[in-house]
Amino acid sequence: ACGGGGGDVGSLISASLFDQMLKYRNDPRCCXXGF
């Protein structure tokens, strides 16, 4: 489960959820604005 590459993250997070994270990343209302 602990791979040396960061590509494993894509397989752990669903594409739809990842897209939401990208949207909220630019959302000033989100606490994780630094993400």
From Swiss-Prot:
Keywords: Carbohydrate metabolism, Chitin degradation, Glycosidase, Hydrolase, Plant defense, Polysaccharide degradation. The keyword Disulfide bond does not apply. The keyword Transcription regulation does not apply. GO terms for molecular function: endochitinase activity. It catalyses: Random endo-hydrolysis of N-acetyl-beta-D-glucosaminide (1->4)-beta-linkages in chitin and chitodextrins. GO terms for biological process: chitin catabolic process; defense response; polysaccharide catabolic process. Its EC number is 3.2.1.14. It is an enzyme of class 3 (hydrolase). Defense against chitin-containing fungal pathogens. Belongs to the glycosyl hydrolase 19 family. Chitinase class I subfamily. This is Basic endochitinase CH1. It comes from Castanea sativa.
